[in-house]
């Protein structure tokens, strides 16, 4: 789950009722397919008691030899009934699968829409494995079990009711014996339901934990190899895997115990039925055909009763998964109270006024009383030790982080008054951690123009980013897939691809977040050349670790413990001999 978000309170009736309502309101929106499926299930259910009823005339008339017409009519009737049941079951199952998959489509779309609208802070705190499980496992469980519940409730209930009617018609006394057992079976099922729900919830959480451990094993495989972390990772995986096995076995024990206990109750009833039936036969009140029909109906009623008793387990799994799914759906989306749009053309003037910020769990401000102005077309660099507040401050510009004090203005308009779409459409970002999608080079570069860039614009952007020659050397050119996490590209190539994407967007304000800090000298030279082209004519905020990359900035702002301690040009700050000079000299000696 995403921390800080309250899960639904398990086991409380109002919560359960709300979950049922939310699940089946979505299923019910496909009511035409649902009604047709129910009618087909009713048709299939009607064939079972009919098969039992046939047994009476077959035994009493057909085997007695005085009804020769039964030689052909009864076998044909049996074949016809089985064929009818098969056709009805096929189309009802198809329709329910259609309903389930359409509901799943809608739920996943709803989940993903909410995911995209979550505040940036929620992703910082999130558990990726748990989040992925909601899409891949929980959503499927909700729709799959929801339609399974309908199938069992409708088809099996109709079968049981119709078979009970046959039993009553054949012998009410024998039927009473059977009906005495049913409440006992229901009580057993309900007693297991609460336990199953608790176990299922724990199993869902452990599945998410397993996903997280495996994901970290994949993402961190180089670190694991270099630091010889094999045993540590095996130990982490073994611990989670063993706990998951224990939960699975507890579920299996509960599921396995439910069926035999129910069957024992039924076996006692069958024994009593046989004893009473023999007494009625000897008294001449029950024929062999009637008893055969009764036993046929009784034999057919066991499976639907078993499925109905097992329904409790499916319901609990459905509700547990629904809690997880709707926890995401109910997340509070990113706040967008802006009513204005930035007037075109945006000049790019940025003003930070007395900005302060404190994280919810912190006991002091991470940023305090920060004020500065960036004129249109200027490049301003933010430097300082790690943790000085540089990234937090810059992330306030696209409103990924909200200041707790002060305000930020673009072209003299407070950004809180600007619609998020309008604000962010005028910003571009190139960061150290480049995010590229598992698609082609053209698709990733064209992403900056919302996919509306033609091949010529993409080629021009690649040329400006010093990447055209490399791309042209590829067999598929711009249509070459970059692979997952752009694994087929080097670090420098990924950075230049991100620069090309920013060039395509052509936003007037640019944010560079340590864009060259993870590169070697040659890659840094190529990327810096591309950045110089990108920065021309744009208002640029630069976060830099390597101070050599910001010497040409119009102004350098030095942060320490969330406060501005120095500002000026590179030569001025060196001459002042303050924190900037100290940091620069340390890096110069290291280089």
UniProtKB/Swiss-Prot annotation:
Annotated ABC transmembrane type-1 domain residues: 35-317
Protein's UniProt keywords contain Cell inner membrane: yes
Cited InterPro entries: AAA+_ATPase (IPR003593), ABC1_TM_dom (IPR011527), ABC1_TM_sf (IPR036640), ABC_transporter-like_ATP-bd (IPR003439), ABC_transporter-like_CS (IPR017871), ABC_transpr_lipidA (IPR011917), P-loop_NTPase (IPR027417), Type_1_exporter (IPR039421)
Protein name: ATP-dependent lipid A-core flippase
TM spans (from-to): 34-54, 71-91, 158-178, 258-278, 285-305
Positions contributing to ATP binding: 384-391
Gene Ontology CC annotations of this record: plasma membrane
Subunit annotation: Homodimer.
Lineage of the organism: Bacteria, Pseudomonadati, Pseudomonadota, Betaproteobacteria, Burkholderiales
PANTHER family, per database record: ATP-BINDING CASSETTE SUB-FAMILY B MEMBER 10, MITOCHONDRIAL, ATP-DEPENDENT PERMEASE MDL1, MITOCHONDRIAL
């Amino acid at each position: 789950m995403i921390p800080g978000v309250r899960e639904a309170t398990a086991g409380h009736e109002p919560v359960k009722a709300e979950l049922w309502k939310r699940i089946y309101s979505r299923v019910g929106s496909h009511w035409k397919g649902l009604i047709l499926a129910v009618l087909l299930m009713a048709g299939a259910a009607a064939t079972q008691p009919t098969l039992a009823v046939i047994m009476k005339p077959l035994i009493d008339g057909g085997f007695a030899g005085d009804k020769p017409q039964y030689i052909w009519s009864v076998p044909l009737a049996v074949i016809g009934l089985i064929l009818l049941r098969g056709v009805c079951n096929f189309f009802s199952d198809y329709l329910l699968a259609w309903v389930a998959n359409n509901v799943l489509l809608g739920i996943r779309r709803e989940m993903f829409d909410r995911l995209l609208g979550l505040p940036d802070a929620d992703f910082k705190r999130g558990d990726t494995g748990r989040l992925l499980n909601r899409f891949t496992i929980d959503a499927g469980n909700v729709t799959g079990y929801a339609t399974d519940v309908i199938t069992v409730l409708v088809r099996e209930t109709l079968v049981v009711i119709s078979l009970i009617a046959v039993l009553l018609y054949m012998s009410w006394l024998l039927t009473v014996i059977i009906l005495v057992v049913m409440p006992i079976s229901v009580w057993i099922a309900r007693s297991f339901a609460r336990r199953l729900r608790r176990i299922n919830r724990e199993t869902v959480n452990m599945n998410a934990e397993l996903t997280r451990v495996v994901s970290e094993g994949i993402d961190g495989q180089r670190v694991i190899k270099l630091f010889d972390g094999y045993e540590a990772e095996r130990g982490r995986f073994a611990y989670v895997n063993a706990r998951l096995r224990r939960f699975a076995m507890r579920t299996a024990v509960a599921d396995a115990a439910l069926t035999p206990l129910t069957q024992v109750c039924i076996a006692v009833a069958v024994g009593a039925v046989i004893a009473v039936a023999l007494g009625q036969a000897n008294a001449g009140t029950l024929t062999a055909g009637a008893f055969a029909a009764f036993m046929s109906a009784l034999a057919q009623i066991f499976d639907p009763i078993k499925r109905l008793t097992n329904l409790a387990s499916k319901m609990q799994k459905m509700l547990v998964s629904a809690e997880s799914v709707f926890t995401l759906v109910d997340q509070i989306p990113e706040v967008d109270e802006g009513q204005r749009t930035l007037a075109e053309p945006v000049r790019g003037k940025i003003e930070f006024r007395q900005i302060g910020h404190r994280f919810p769990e912190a006991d002091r401000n991470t940023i305090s009383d920060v004020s500065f102005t960036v004129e249109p077309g200027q490049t301003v660099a933010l430097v300082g030790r790690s943790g000085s507040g540089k990234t937090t401050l810059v992330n306030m510009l696209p409103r990924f982080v909200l200041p707790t004090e002060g305000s930020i203005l673009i072209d003299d308009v407070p950004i809180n008054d600007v619609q998020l779409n309008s604000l962010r459409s005028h910003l571009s970002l190139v960061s150290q951690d480049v995010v590229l999608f598992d698609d082609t080079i053209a698709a990733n570069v064209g992403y900056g123009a919302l996919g509306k860039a033609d091949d010529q614009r993409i080629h021009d952007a690649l040329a400006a980013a010093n990447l055209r020659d490399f791309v042209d050397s590829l067999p598929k050119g711009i249509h070459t897939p970059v692979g997952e996490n752009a694994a087929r590209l080097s670090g420098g190539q990924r950075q230049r691809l991100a620069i090309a994407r920013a060039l395509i967007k052509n936003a007037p304000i640019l944010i560079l977040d340590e864009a060259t800090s993870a590169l070697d000298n040659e890659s840094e030279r190529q990327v810096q050349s591309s950045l110089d082209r990108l920065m021309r004519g744009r208002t640029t905020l630069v976060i830099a670790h390597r101070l050599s990359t910001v010497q040409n900035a119009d102004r350098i702002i030095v942060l320490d413990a969330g406060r501005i301690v120095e500002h000026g040009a590179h030569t001025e700050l060196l001459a002042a001999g303050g924190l900037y000079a100290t940091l620069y000299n340390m890096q110069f000696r290291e280089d």
